[in-house]
Amino acid sequence: MVSFSSLLLAVSAVSGALAAPGDSTLVELAKRAITSSETGTNNGYYYSFWTNGGGDVEYTNGNGGQYSVKWTNCDNFVAGKGWNPGSAKTVTYSGEWESNSNSYVSLYGWTQNPLVEYYIVDKYGDYDPSTGATELGTVESDGGTYKIYKTTRENAPSIEGTSTFNQYWSVRQSGRVGGTITAQNHFDAWANVGLQLGTHNYMILATEGYKSSGSATITVE
């Protein structure tokens, strides 16, 4: 397979021969639709797009902290922009999201030692992602009430390959797309009910879809 970096070098050589500096060719390449799992940096933000390959999913990096994703009859994907490593930061974002089925918008990330996948969910469709999870309490943050949950995934995909690991959830009870998420409040609340995080890996303002269709455009500030 020809790598994108090799393609970019080839296009750079051609554009240098055919166009003046400042030509928009490379800018448009940077906004290409991504359809298979990929991570990287874009405009100073870390981005992550993971898909298990089912259905049609297109992820596109926009200007600054913006990204868009469209999906039709997907199986499972997670996509977004943020930071690597993550931290107990305050995140402000805005955007639009449309999906009346199994999809959600969240501050999403991973830690290692212990391996934990976490979600601070601001909006979900007609399926509550905490279904079947163990409820441990609530946390008041950023003008809303979030319920705290824990689940365990066995032999599931992770940043360390197929593994067994815990998921921590904060799920906002009055959904919204846009606002501020104070991660420290959730991390503290989780610790208070015995949910310990490890060393931060990446953190993104994510859109996730599971066996659904929809679209989202999100900007991290």
UniProtKB/Swiss-Prot annotation:
GO biological process: xylan catabolic process
SUPFAM superfamilies documented for this protein: Concanavalin A-like lectins/glucanases
GO molecular function: endo-1,4-beta-xylanase activity
Transmembrane segments: none
Organism per entry: Aspergillus oryzae (strain ATCC 42149 / RIB 40) (Yellow koji mold)
Keywords: Carbohydrate metabolism, Glycosidase, Hydrolase, Polysaccharide degradation, Secreted, Signal, Xylan degradation
Function description: Endo-1,4-beta-xylanase involved in the hydrolysis of xylan, a major structural heterogeneous polysaccharide found in plant biomass representing the second most abundant polysaccharide in the biosphere, after cellulose.
Gene: xlnB
Catalytic activity reported: Endohydrolysis of (1->4)-beta-D-xylosidic linkages in xylans
Pathway named in the protein's UniProt entry: Glycan degradation; xylan degradation
Signal peptide interval: 1-19
Broad class of enzyme this protein falls into: hydrolase
Cellular component terms per the entry's GO annotation: extracellular region
Active site annotation, chain numbering: E117 (nucleophile), E208 (proton donor)
The protein, known as: Probable endo-1,4-beta-xylanase B
Listed EC numbers: 3.2.1.8
Principal location listed in the UniProt entry: secreted
Protein's cellular compartments: Secreted
Domain GH11: 33-221
Family the UniProt entry places it in: Belongs to the glycosyl hydrolase 11 (cellulase G) family.
Keyword match Kinase: no
